Amino acid sequence: MATLNQGSLSLLLISCVLGASVSVPASAEDGIIVTGRNVQGFMVGRPSFGKDPYPSTANANPSQQILRATGGELSDNDFAGVSSGSTITRAILPNGDLPGLSNTLGNNSAGLGAGAAAGHASGNSLGGQISGSIERGLAPLNNIGAMMGVQP
């Protein structure tokens, strides 16, 4: 096994410094990020078809409209004026719930499936309906856990 002497170590150090100083810095193009590209197969010995002419891309550069609208950095008032979207339920859905998907069963509360859903949904909101659906869907797993002796 060869040992390194002082001359070879200094030569290695100098070559690393020179290599790092003359390396080309990494640079991106104009902010276009390629998120997906179709790979086109080709036979060995034949030239490739080239890059995908229609790659899936995203443009990271802000457009001139955005730059003009913001006028620079966003302030606290800009963030305070953003709506949470909570009023869209009243604007799109009648009475705030989806017709036909409400949790109220009318006068007959012992209808089909009422035993599985009784008391599990919280109100007439869409969130309550989704929560009730998830609980009904997970009921078989809860039953398996009860058979195994796991207490909820």
UniProtKB/Swiss-Prot annotation:
Residues forming coiled coils: none
Alphabetized UniProt keyword annotations: Chaperone, Periplasm, Signal
Transmembrane segments: none
Signal peptide location: 1-28
Disruption phenotype: Deletion of just fapA in an overexpressing strain yields less dense fibrils around the cells. Deletion of the entire fapA-fapF six-gene locus shows no visible growth phenotype.
Chaperone among keywords: yes
Taxonomic superkingdom: Bacteria
UniProt-annotated location(s): Periplasm
GO cellular component terms listed in the entry, alphabetical order: periplasmic space
Location (main, coarse): periplasm
Domain notes: Soluble monomeric FapA is predominantly disordered.
Summary of the function given for this chain in its UniProt record: An intrinsically disordered chaperone for fibril amyloid FapC that guards against fibrillation, probably within the periplasm. FapA inhibits FapC fibrillation and elongation of FapB fibrils in vitro. Upon overexpression of the endogenous six-gene locus (fapA-fapF) in situ, cells form large clumps during liquid growth, make large amounts of biofilm and produce amyloid fibrils. Expression of the 6 gene operon in E.coli strain BL21(DE3) induces flocculation and biofilm formation with copious extracellular fibrils.
Membership in a protein family: Belongs to the FapA family.
Oligomer and partners: Monomer in solution. Interacts with FapC but not FapB in vitro.
This protein's name: Functional amyloid chaperone FapA
Protein source organism: Pseudomonas fluorescens
Lineage, top ranks: Bacteria, Pseudomonadati, Pseudomonadota, Gammaproteobacteria, Pseudomonadales
